[in-house]
Amino acid sequence: MTKDMCEVTYIHEDKVNRAKKDLAKQNPMDVAKVFKALSDDTRVKIAYVLSLEGELCVCDVANIIESSTATASHHLRLLKNLGIAKYRKEGKLVYYSLDDEHVKQLVEKAFLHQREVASIG
């Protein structure tokens, strides 16, 4: 038996029932899609720089992540389709930004958490 497992089986029915009831009202699959999109380090880099700069054109993003504009566009389009980013067109340029403050906070908190974990270990 390992230290990180219960040695006996005991179900806390009140907590389990409450959690199941609340979980049934949520949409974990859609939330999982957000985390799946952000599980790619290139897309995390893009989300991070958008949280810093507010808005960047596709060419700038491509330069920052050291890729072609086609590759940057692919990642940005995926982020847009999942509600993480939005875009606007100005003349011949397309500018992307994070969809809203919640997304920005999610990205910032993830980086903060990573720094805290790194400082402990």
From Swiss-Prot:
Keywords: Cadmium resistance, DNA-binding, Transcription, Transcription regulation, Transposable element. GO terms for biological process: response to cadmium ion. Pfam families: HTH_5. PROSITE patterns: HTH_ARSR_1, HTH_ARSR_2. Residues 58-77 bind DNA. Gene3D superfamilies: Winged helix-like DNA-binding domain superfamily/Winged helix DNA-binding domain. Residues 23-118 form the HTH arsR-type domain. GO terms for molecular function: DNA binding; DNA-binding transcription factor activity. InterPro entries: ArsR-like_HTH (IPR011991), ArsR_HTH (IPR018334), HTH_ArsR_DNA-bd_dom (IPR001845), Metal_resp_trans_reg (IPR051011), WH-like_DNA-bd_sf (IPR036388), WH_DNA-bd_sf (IPR036390). NCBIfam families: HTH_metalloreg (NF033788). This is Cadmium resistance transcriptional regulatory protein CadC homolog. The lineage of its organism: Bacteria, Bacillati, Bacillota, Bacilli, Bacillales.
